[in-house]
Amino acid sequence: PMNTGAEAVETGIKVARKYAQDVRGITAPEIIVMAGNFHGRTTTVISFSDDPVARDGFGPFTPGFVTVPFGDAAALESAITPNTAAVLLEPVQGEAGVVVPPTGYLAKVREITAAHGVLMIADEIQSGLARTGYTTAVEYDGVVPDLYLLGKALGGGVVPVSAVVGNADVLGVLTPGTHGSTFGGNPLAAAVATAVIRILATGEFQLRSRELGERLHAGLRTLAGGGVTAVRGRGLWAGVDIDPALGSARDVALLLQKRGILAKDTHERTLRFAPPLVIE
């Protein structure tokens, strides 16, 4: 357990590198990441970001990352070399505009990584814990990655807590003294995270997210042609592209705020909607 999502990502990277060196004998491990990714704003994480807002002015950057297009399994397989330690991806890219990959893509990634002995790391910090309609978004493709990165909703909106979840044969490369965090796993955070997990174990909120998500997306799709050019997403999570003739996504977000609707703009033209799972 850690505190923030970015810490979970950093932990996942450390595990992947340590596993590659200790188990596979790779002395210069590389991690394949996706174009359009967002995994946080720490120095290492922005080293493989392609967002100039997050990246510009913060170099020199950490090496060891290779970027491929999101949703392109063939490009991913072509990028794998004997030095490839892991593939890190978001099952649904949130900051990019709630971008959903083609059906079967995640299953293909799992097939490719398994065939090459490469770890698959699913960053479910935004997409996980019922947000997309299942406990994790990789479930849409029936995938079980080597590592799950969890955060945000894990703290119930109350406390910062994140986690890296996987089997002992992978996580076991971290031995006492190799990794830690002062407040990681503190009693309050652990209690809240445990309560969240128990609530999700009922399946009620996953079902609620799917059912209300259908209503959300159906309603948003009716706006197509009236200032909306595209609607994407899963469960209670949607990305809506705004026609530039209407204004910027930030302009629209501020107008919605005046009407009591909270939305977050991203990349000038997209609004993201992520209503609470308890919404009526």
Where are these regions (language model features)?
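Conserved N-terminal phosphate-binding loop of PLP-dependent enzymes in the Aspartate aminotransferase
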Residues: 1-280
